[in-house]
């Protein structure tokens, strides 16, 4: 989860968190088929493992898609050291909708693939790279579809901006070594782009699984409970409560 700024937390709490507050749908409808196509497009490059040709080609594609929807795109490049001393040429992609708005929301996901399928039930595949359709591509696909629908609706308020951040070098870590994971996100947190701050953020991770259900995550409830409740309530009111059970997980 992402920790809220205190002002945002207080304002959210003042607005109330119960289900009696209506949440009106805004903007054009999210298209699941479009998001699926964006997932498939990323996978068509092959596993997007660090320093690979597939990784480089997918980076260019993601940037071009965000730009095609009129978003302002910047990259944050860094050479980051992996667990075995390998240097990862990492690129965080930052795509801004309505970049001049002072009130901003951060939406993020990682876009790289894990180089080893070490959790595959078939042990013969443990040294093969992961295609990462769900764990990586699905989150980026949701962000691309959100960028598409936001850019398509000219009636939306210009007072709110959204920054979509695709984190790199996420998934080459080792179990038991927390610092070896999320290298791109760690770099982003330590080198926050100048002039950007957010009222709150949402991290999308493994959101494309068949029959997926999303429970309220513990760290998010600890640091941003009012926002979590608003998101889950909005899902229920929009008819998607079966995907967002009203329970912690």
Tell me the role of every PLM-derived stretch:
Residues 39, 43-50, 66-70, 97, ...:
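Sec/Tat-exported extracytoplasmic proteins
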Residues 37-100:
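A non-catalytic alpha/beta surface segment that caps or lines the substrate-entry region
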Residues 4-27:
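Ser/Thr/Pro/Gly-rich low-complexity linker/stalk segments immediately outside membranes or between
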Residues 48-50, 79-82, 100-101, 111-115, ...:
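Solvent-exposed loop/turn segments at secondary-structure junctions
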Residues 77, 87, 200, 207-249:
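Active-site-adjacent substrate-binding region
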Residues 34-41, 57, 61-68, 73, ...:
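Extracytoplasmic/secreted proteins, especially bacterial periplasmic and envelope-associated proteins
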Residues 18-23, 36-48, 126, 211-214:
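Acidic/histidine-rich, surface-exposed loop or edge segments in extracytoplasmic proteins
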